[in-house]
Regions:
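Hydrophobic alpha-helical transmembrane segments
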Residues: 2-17, 21-65, 69, 99-129
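Acidic (Asp/Glu-rich) catalytic motifs at the cytosolic membrane interface
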Residues: 62-98
Length: 129
């Protein structure tokens, strides 16, 4: 049992190191971090339903997962092809496109979920003046 727990702790530590690597080396990771924090804070403020929370959490996770995979693809491509190579460029471009699609989808989902209750709150605030 002790070996099982220590190996789980080690695995979690490696995962955190990977996440920190992405945050340190990828400029877009800072955008994802800020967006994640803002969406979560807004979700609490708007008192979202469990269903809306589930969708937002899955959406945030999707963007992070694709960013992690993109970073892995970039690092492996650099390792395999340190010189400029047209196929290496295609590999990186396609991987970056996946992040772009995930991020764009997350914005649309965020607007669909957060938009109506946010407008309601804003209208309520305006009507008090």
């Amino acid at each position: 049992m002790t070996h099982f727990l220590s190996s789980r702790v080690r695995a979690i530590r490696f995962a955190i190191e990977g996440w920190l690597y992405v945050i340190r080396t990828q400029q877009n990771a800072w955008i994802h971090t800020l967006a994640s924090i803002c969406v979560i804070a807004m979700g609490f403020w708007l008192q979202l339903s469990k269903q809306d929370w589930a969708i937002l959490i899955l959406t945030i996770a999707m963007v992070w997962i694709v960013e992690f995979i993109n970073t892995s693809v970039e690092v492996l491509t650099d390792l395999a092809s340190p010189q400029r190579n047209s196929l290496a460029k295609v590999t990186k471009d396609v991987s970056a496109a996946a992040v772009l699609i995930a991020a764009a989808a997350s914005v649309i989902i965020g607007v669909l979920i957060l938009g109506p209750p946010l407008l309601e709150k804003i209208q309520a605030l305006i009507s008090t003046f």
